[in-house]
Design a protein with these regions (language model features):
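Short, flexible turn/loop "capping" segments at secondary-structure junctions
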Residues: 2-6, 66-70
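Core segments of cupin and vicinal oxygen chelate
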Residues: 3, 14-55
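Vicinal oxygen chelate
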Residues: 7, 17-20, 76-120, 125
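Hydrophobic adenine-recognition pocket in adenosine-nucleotide-binding enzymes
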Residues: 12, 75
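A short beta-turn/loop motif at secondary-structure boundaries
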Residues: 38-41, 66-67, 103-106
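Short beta-strand micro-motifs in enzyme catalytic cores
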Residues: 44-46, 73, 109-111
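Short, charged/polar surface micro-motifs in flexible loops or helix N-caps
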Residues: 53-55, 66-68, 82-85
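Short, charged/polar, Gly/Pro-enriched secondary-structure boundary elements
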Residues: 53-58, 118-122
Length: 125
């Protein structure tokens, strides 16, 4: 078997139920910018990024049905220090998010909270 080339993570795709609600959350709570929006086949798509050099880090597709569970365990965002974890916590509280959970893992400090469709978000250092 040949060796794999060096790879880096490119982007995450999420099947969503309510694309407007999810775009609102990811832009207003997590600081993403909506970079593009349109149709891909029969699905409405939204592209979001926090990196001005990347067209998208997340693509959302309005393809999930109301009765389908999310299959994402968690989406994790690394920050530089405890102050930035605390800022994320305070921002989530101010946004009225329920189910916020700060956790000391010993090797990392994290805050967890759900997005509007139940995907678990982690901000950690």
């Amino acid at each position: 078997m040949s060796e794999l080339p060096r790879m880096s993570f490119g982007h995450l795709g999420i099947d969503v139920i309510d694309i407007d609600q999810m775009v609102d959350f990811y832009t207003n709570v997590l600081g993403f910018k909506l970079t593009d929006r349109g149709l891909g086949g029969k699905a409405e798509l939204a592209f979001l990024s926090r990196n001005p050099e990347e067209h998208h880090q997340i693509v959302m597709a309005a393809t999930r049905k109301d009765n389908e569970r999310t299959t994402i365990n968690q989406i994790s965002f690394r920050v530089n220090d405890f102050q930035e974890v605390r800022q994320a916590y305070d921002h989530a509280v101010a946004a009225g998010i329920e189910g916020i959970e700060p956790v000391d893992h010993g090797s990392a400090l994290s805050v967890y909270f759900p997005d509007p469709e139940g995907n678990r978000i982690e901000v950690y250092m």
